[in-house]
Every structure is written in structure tokens, then in C-alpha cells.
Amino acid sequence: APVGLWLQLPGLDTGALVRSLFGALPGFPLVCALTQMDPMSMPRPPAGPAVRTLDYIDTARVTLAGGFDAYWEARGKNLRANLKKQRNRLERDGIATRLEIARDPAAMAQAVEDYARLEGSGWKAGAGTAVRAGDAQGRYYRAMLEAMARQDAASVYRYHFGENLVAMDLCVEDRDSIVVLKTAYDETVPASLSPALLMREEAMRSLFDGGRFARLEFYGRVMEWHTRWTEEVRTMYHVNHYRWPALRHLHALREARQRRAAGAPTDEQGS
């Protein structure tokens, strides 16, 4: 059963803390699982007689150091050439681009409405997963962004072609990092233009030049388009601490049998 947030001071032995927790929890717990751990915050422990780690997801980040020009020069030639070509086309057509960044708590309700309109115009609407400003998901994002903005820890990026809103990012922040939670773009824009990529280029320049953050994080599982912007990918993980080593062995055997029955590979990460 879920217990709650795991929070510990740096330098402490996580295994020793878990073993002490076994004695403090009610009943007779056999396994304590710490899930979705970030190796940047807590290094992945080696496997041991009563410790087993499992891969969760790969996730991506950009270290905002060294200046934008050096960063941009390190991006793929195709990305740089493609976006330059798009900007030239927009200029020939007399279409000005504009990046706006909103941080005011009072601006977050409209931001969620604008985001919902963008996402609702695309494939997510057909799949039933698009954010809607008036549903539970939309209300959650509004409340969360307003609360974070009151702590100066939220931002919304809007990108325009002329007066038309064509792409958005919803972001949260802490002292050192900005996290891109969600991205949407206008899918009615001609396929020869990539508003989300054009927005990302200008947003990256702004972040490098601003110097406020040490890194940008792409929330969630790494996607193909993330790899156009960074090579920094790390694997988040789960770690199981077992009361006895025999339990770890039995758990691994059970999962291996299930995988064989399903025809899946039986290699165990960190076994």
C-alpha cells in the first residue's frame, strides 16, 4: 500500500533508513519499494542480497551552460537548417513571430483556456485526452499553475505567427530548473511549418541568455523530438528493499516465470 513521500538528508544510508522503517511500520511489511527515483537526486544503488533496482523511464534535460550559440551549433544540422528555412519563409510572407512569457498568477486561467483550445484542435481531441479548461484536468492545471505562480515558480510560453497563437508550453520551476510539463501547437498550421520547434528555439535562447536556471527538464518519458534538443538522457528507476534476501530471490523468480509465459525477455536490470 502507498505510504507517502520519501524524503531523506543527503549522505545518509538509504538501506539503513528502510530497515529502520520496517520496524516502525504497522503489521509485518516484507518489501519497501521506492518508486520513480531520479539518479540526479539519489544515485542508483548497486544490487545487493536484499536490494533490487528496476528501470522506470528514460527522461531528458538540457544543461543551460556555455551560451546559446555553442548549444545551437551542437544541434543537428537538419534541425538548424530546417528552422532557418522556415524563418526565411515566414519573413518572405510578412509573418512576424513573437514569443511571450507569462508568470502572473492572474494570467494562468486564460493560459489554460488558450492551451485547451490549441490541444483541442488536434489529434488528442479525437483520442479524448485533450485538456479542457472546464473539466477536472483543466481545473487541476489552473489551480496548480496559479499556486505555483504565486510562489514565482510557474511560467507559460506562448508563440504567435502574427496575431495567431500557434504553440504553447506549460512550465513549473524551482530554484535551479524549469520543467516543461506540456506542449501543444496548432495542428491546422501548414505541415511545412513547425511552430512548436520554432518556439523551442526562441525559448532556449531566452533561457540561456536569462541565466536564471541551470537546466531545463522535459517532463516524463523521453520522446524522439526531445533528442533533437539534447543528448542528456538519464534512466529513472525503482528500488525494492526486502526484509530478507530470500524474498528478493523469490520475487525475481516469479517475475522471470511470468515473462517467459508472456514470451518476453527475462533479463533483469540490476539483478
Please place each PLM-identified region on the residue numbering:
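ATP-hydrolysis module of ASCE/P-loop NTPase motor domains
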Residues: 18-41
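Conserved acyl-donor/pantetheine-binding loop and adjacent beta-alpha core of acyl/acetyltransferases
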Residues: 1-5, 177
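Aromatic (often tryptophan-rich) hydrophobic motifs at membrane interfaces
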Residues: 9-12, 19-23, 130-251
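Intrinsically disordered, low-complexity proline-rich regions
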Residues: 2, 12-13, 28, 39, ...
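A conserved beta-strand-loop-helix scaffold within acyl/acetyltransferase catalytic domains
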Residues: 36-192
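Short catalytic-loop micro-motif centered on adjacent basic/acidic residues
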Residues: 31-33, 100, 215-217
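Flexible, glycine/proline-enriched loop segments at strand-loop-helix junctions
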Residues: 5-11, 70-75
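Active-site/acyl-donor-binding loops of N-acyltransferases
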Residues: 43-74, 211-271
